[in-house]
Amino acid sequence: SREWIYVKDHCEALLKVFKKGKIGEFYNIGSNKNLNNLEICKSLIKIAKSIITIGPNVKIQFVKDRPGHDIRYALNSKKILKKLKWKTSIEFKKGLEKTFLWYLHNNNYYKSISKKDIVKRLGTK
């Protein structure tokens, strides 16, 4: 599983650390919202169906994990909550919907990434 956080919440946490954090201290920025990739895929399909027309036969394709894949990515973000009084403000599913809409309306951003760059990142041929 992975810990998911909406980008605006993350930015607000960074600003809080810059303004109120103690120099030399570290602050883990987390949401305490751990979901696995399958849960994310199912949520995205549900969001997509509510916004755009997609076929009834949407299927999730399972692929082999990459070498060295970690089973869980999670943070202990108690310190930023306790010391800086910061926590996420956007509910996870709302943040995921906002992210989906951003990509839907800003496709020039990701369409500029070449197939070559994707292959290089994934280490596939």
Predicted regions and their residues:
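C-terminal substrate-binding subdomain of Rossmann-fold SDR/epimerase-dehydratase oxidoreductases
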Residues: 1-125
